[in-house]
């Protein structure tokens, strides 16, 4: 389950049931999409137990509309607030858990991942792919384009998850709830069936307190215990609420096999 939390919002991905839909796909495109679907549904169960470092750079801006399309404006405006949160992410038994190590390079004490004010995210390790590719979600896929990325041949598919399998938005001020559809693109290497990137945008009612939520996750092959796995290396999350824009940039690094002797890193220190 993916949770994004602010003072006014909790986002929960629902798990309703229906059938996968495909439109305007060639036989080869449908074959690749089906192979990726099978991989996505098994993904979290095939990952080994591991530890990595998750570093989240959070900024809050004021007065920037359509921030996702203006994020590369130069010079970028100064944020109202910003912080950097370094966490140890432990993946064991198919579940993610987080230990907050530092906040702005200072030891974090007893801070908890989901108790921060502002926006935090989770679920990059297979949850979003399972929700999109699960036949129960009734996701509609269509062909978008062919491109290149870092020297790799890439096929891009558009997708849309309907309202009945969508995302629940709950306004914590009014307790008013909506379930909204979401849509995006998935980037696939057709030779290896690796997923390289996924994007999503929530289709939010105009009268809701949150105007926009966009997410992007980049994946690459990482080696753990001598074997290759396709894992997140970077994620971005943008949310617009009133005149405020919440902008998270998340990096994943230092993947290694989980063991009882794994090392925790605190900034420049290492603690056994």
Question: Where are each of the predicted segments found?
Answer:
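Bacterial N-terminal signal peptides that target proteins for export
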Residues: 1-8
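Structured extracytoplasmic
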Residues: 20-183, 190-197, 201-215, 220-272
